[in-house]
Amino acid sequence: MKKSGILNKELNTLLASLGHTDTIVIADCGLPIPNEQARIDLSLVKGFPPFLSVLDAVVDELEIEAIVLAEEIKDQNPDLYESIRARMGGVPVQFVPHEQFKAMTKQAKAVIRTGEATPYANIILRSGVSFSSKDF
């Protein structure tokens, strides 16, 4: 049995498959996911698992070089926005209108659906690399 970190088989497989610049989405329970889109549905009941718990688990295991948020999150869900900023540190953030965000999710390798039930609790994570030429 795995000792720590993410236990979900599908989520582990997804994260291990990501290469540089690949994107994934962590979504609330209301974000529309196209039928043809790969998805990992972690939702159990409204509110569980919460968005931030899933984000924390993914951030612990994935090198992230940039994120995308719906610009509406700043006004419609400022507490969540501040929590995301605190977790992401200096990672560059791109803000786009929610409709554009939904269109961008179609390019992601997968959407991870949480039970989160607050507005605009969605994020696109762009995979980075965990080494640089300075390492050699």
Curated annotation (Swiss-Prot):
Record-linked InterPro entries: D-ribose_pyranase, RbsD-like_sf, RbsD_FucU
Gene3D superfamilies: RbsD-like domain
Residue positions of the active site: 20 (proton donor)
Molecular function in Gene Ontology: D-ribose pyranase activity; intramolecular lyase activity; monosaccharide binding
EC number per UniProt: 5.4.99.62
Enzyme class label: isomerase
The UniProt record lists the keyword Ubl conjugation: no
SUPFAM superfamilies noted in UniProt: RbsD-like
Transmembrane segments: none
Binding site for substrate: 28, 98, 120-122
Keyword Cell wall biogenesis/degradation recorded: no
Annotated function: Catalyzes the interconversion of beta-pyran and beta-furan forms of D-ribose.
Quaternary structure annotation from Swiss-Prot or TrEMBL: Homodecamer.
UniProt xrefs under HAMAP family: D_rib_pyranase
Record-given protein name: D-ribose pyranase
Source organism: Geobacillus kaustophilus (strain HTA426)
Gene name in the database record: rbsD
